[in-house]
């Protein structure tokens, strides 16, 4: 009986989803493919850029716990699925 109980406990632990970690893109270029695993608690991917610099400079991508605030002429896109901040 103890063996059966122990087996059930082990199977339960192995099968549990012990947590999900978001992955976001991080790089300063307009076109990006560098993937980063977010820290625990960071559940937002974002892409932020200055609308005056549309030719690819001034991009910031990353993970955050909340969507960053707008400043000056920034454009910010926030999302919550893997690599959604393309």
Swiss-Prot record:
InterPro entries on file: Snake_3FTx, Snake_toxin-like_sf, Snake_toxin_con_site, Toxin_cobra-type
PROSITE patterns tied to this protein: SNAKE_TOXIN
Residues spanning the signal sequence: 1-21
Keyword check for Secreted: yes
Tissues where the protein occurs: Expressed by the venom gland.
Disulfide bonds: 24-45, 27-32, 38-63, 67-78, 79-84
Principal place of residence: secreted
Compartments where found: Secreted
One GO CC annotation: extracellular region
Highest taxon, organism lineage: Eukaryota
UniProt GO molecular function: acetylcholine receptor inhibitor activity; ion channel regulator activity; toxin activity
Gene3D superfamilies (alphabetical): CD59 (2.10.60.10)
Record carries keyword Transcription regulation: no
UniProt similarity note: Belongs to the three-finger toxin family. Ancestral subfamily. Orphan group II sub-subfamily.
Function in brief: Binds with low affinity to muscular (alpha-1-beta-1-delta-epsilon/CHRNA1-CHRNB1-CHRND-CHRNE) and very low affinity to neuronal (alpha-7/CHRNA7) nicotinic acetylcholine receptor (nAChR).
Protein name per Swiss-Prot or TrEMBL: Probable weak neurotoxin NNAM3
Organism (species): Naja atra (Chinese cobra)
Top-level taxonomy: Eukaryota, Metazoa, Chordata, Craniata, Vertebrata
């Amino acid at each position: 009986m103890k063996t059966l109980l122990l087996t059930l406990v082990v199977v339960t632990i192995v099968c549990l989803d012990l947590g999900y970690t978001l992955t976001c893109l991080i790089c300063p270029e307009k076109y990006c493919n560098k993937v980063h695993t977010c820290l625990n608690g960071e559940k937002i991917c974002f892409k932020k850029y200055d609308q005056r610099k549309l030719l690819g400079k001034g991009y910031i991508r990353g993970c955050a716990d909340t969507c960053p605030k707008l400043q000056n002429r920034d454009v910010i896109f926030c999302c919550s699925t893997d690599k959604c901040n393309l």
